[in-house]
Amino acid sequence: MKIKAKNIVKIYDQKLPSELKALDKVTTEINQGEFIAIIGQTGSGKTTFIQHMNALLLPDQGEIEYLYFDSKNQEKKLVVQKPRFFRKKLKFINEIRRRVGVVFQFAEYQLFEQTIEKDIIFGAVSMGTPKNEAKKIAAEIIELVGLDQSFLQKSPFELSGGQKRRVAIAGILAMDPDIIFFDEPTAGLDPQGTLKMLEILDTLYKKGKTIILATHDLDSVLEWTKRCIFFKDGRIIYDGDTYSILANNKFLIENKMLPTNLLNFREKLIKIGYPISNVRSVSELISEINMLIQKETNAD
């Protein structure tokens, strides 16, 4: 599946000044097989954007185009605009939500007060999967998100915050969407929990899912993604290579997105193939990355 957002505008309160938009002429594309980071501070528009991609919200202006192949392998196109009538909305909303999944930051609100197995089975059955087959899917998916079979018989109130997020991911995976958005999946997790969560996302990506990770933490995305979409005040102010942002010291400082752990950050860059020397400050690190990017540009 491919998603094209074209000049999306969202205004929650029409009485507010016109410049106070939750989304302001947002235009971007999400292609099949990408692992993208959506970066921005709290209130920048990240979550509102995600809610539009999943049809939880509809744009006040602009349109969202979905390109996908149906069960007969025929290419389909679905264009979403603000509908005039509710009946028109029903024609596309189920198809979008079947193909575009969302795991929100507060995952416990996506879980029912029943066993984890029933939670996961519900997602599969809602997409037309027979119940017996859905039970087998639940057993496979629970291990995919790093939990053993014993968790299937537990209830949500028995789980930690990180475990609840994994179960929420399992419920979405049971619906087998093409694209999955994760809204602040590492928020509130300890370093070990953060690493495990990112490893789960990377595993899903390698299995062919399109993954979009929304976060305000620059450190947690550099090892895993190469493209990022940077939101500020409801607008996209950058959409491109993650590391190219680091070539602009002023941009990072103005948007308060400097890496918090310089040593850890340097090690991540080396791990993915950037030969960074022993730098002593963020400014030195940025300067060295700038030279590497320039060298790669000249080579091309």
UniProtKB/Swiss-Prot annotation:
<feature type="binding site">
    <location>
        <begin position="40"/>
        <end position="47"/>
    </location>
    <ligand>
        <name>ATP</name>
    </ligand>
</feature>
<dbReference type="InterPro" id="IPR003593">
    <property type="entry name" value="AAA+_ATPase"/>
</dbReference>
<dbReference type="GO" id="GO:0043190">
    <property type="term" value="C:ATP-binding cassette (ABC) transporter complex"/>
</dbReference>
<dbReference type="InterPro" id="IPR017871">
    <property type="entry name" value="ABC_transporter-like_CS"/>
</dbReference>
<dbReference type="InterPro" id="IPR015856">
    <property type="entry name" value="ABC_transpr_CbiO/EcfA_su"/>
</dbReference>
<dbReference type="InterPro" id="IPR050095">
    <property type="entry name" value="ECF_ABC_transporter_ATP-bd"/>
</dbReference>
<keyword id="KW-0472">Membrane</keyword>
<comment type="similarity">
    <text>Belongs to the ABC transporter superfamily. Energy-coupling factor EcfA family.</text>
</comment>
<dbReference type="GO" id="GO:0005524">
    <property type="term" value="F:ATP binding"/>
</dbReference>
<keyword id="KW-0813">Transport</keyword>
<feature type="domain" description="ABC transporter">
    <location>
        <begin position="3"/>
        <end position="258"/>
    </location>
</feature>
<keyword id="KW-0067">ATP-binding</keyword>
<dbReference type="GO" id="GO:0016887">
    <property type="term" value="F:ATP hydrolysis activity"/>
</dbReference>
<comment type="subunit">
    <text>Forms a stable energy-coupling factor (ECF) transporter complex composed of 2 membrane-embedded substrate-binding proteins (S component), 2 ATP-binding proteins (A component) and 2 transmembrane proteins (T component).</text>
</comment>
<dbReference type="GO" id="GO:0042626">
    <property type="term" value="F:ATPase-coupled transmembrane transporter activity"/>
</dbReference>
<dbReference type="InterPro" id="IPR027417">
    <property type="entry name" value="P-loop_NTPase"/>
</dbReference>
<keyword id="KW-1278">Translocase</keyword>
<dbReference type="InterPro" id="IPR003439">
    <property type="entry name" value="ABC_transporter-like_ATP-bd"/>
</dbReference>
<protein>
    <recommendedName>
        <fullName>Energy-coupling factor transporter ATP-binding protein EcfA2</fullName>
        <ecNumber>7.-.-.-</ecNumber>
    </recommendedName>
</protein>
<dbReference type="Pfam" id="PF00005">
    <property type="entry name" value="ABC_tran"/>
</dbReference>
<keyword id="KW-0547">Nucleotide-binding</keyword>
<comment type="function">
    <text>ATP-binding (A) component of a common energy-coupling factor (ECF) ABC-transporter complex. Unlike classic ABC transporters this ECF transporter provides the energy necessary to transport a number of different substrates.</text>
</comment>
<keyword id="KW-1003">Cell membrane</keyword>
